[in-house]
Amino acid sequence: MAHKKGASSSRNGRDSNAQRLGVKRFGGQSVSAGEILVRQRGTHFHPGVNVGRGGDDTLFALSAGAVEFGTKRGRKTVNIVPAAAEV
């Protein structure tokens, strides 16, 4: 095994692909059930009303409505406010 670099070799040249994390739907936007709201590692945002959490901590809408960001007990939460039912 060579312990020195050979001619024109390098120890660099590797990088991982971006994970495309972050908020996907912002406050006030209307969403339908099942839409992804936040992609995250860990629970930076916690699920609130009408919001579910996936196995990779992704937050998604459980019902249609408008996105609302807020806090509860010092934690950032994401809620879905249902649209007014039409009569």
Curated annotation (Swiss-Prot):
GO terms for cellular component: cytosolic large ribosomal subunit. The keyword Ribosomal protein applies. The keyword Hydrolase does not apply. Residues 7-19 have a biased composition (Polar residues). Keywords: Ribonucleoprotein, Ribosomal protein. One of its GO terms (biological process) is translation. Residues 1-25 are annotated as: Disordered. Belongs to the bacterial ribosomal protein bL27 family. PANTHER family: LARGE RIBOSOMAL SUBUNIT PROTEIN BL27M (PTHR15893:SF0), RIBOSOMAL PROTEIN L27 (PTHR15893). This is Large ribosomal subunit protein bL27. The gene is rpmA.
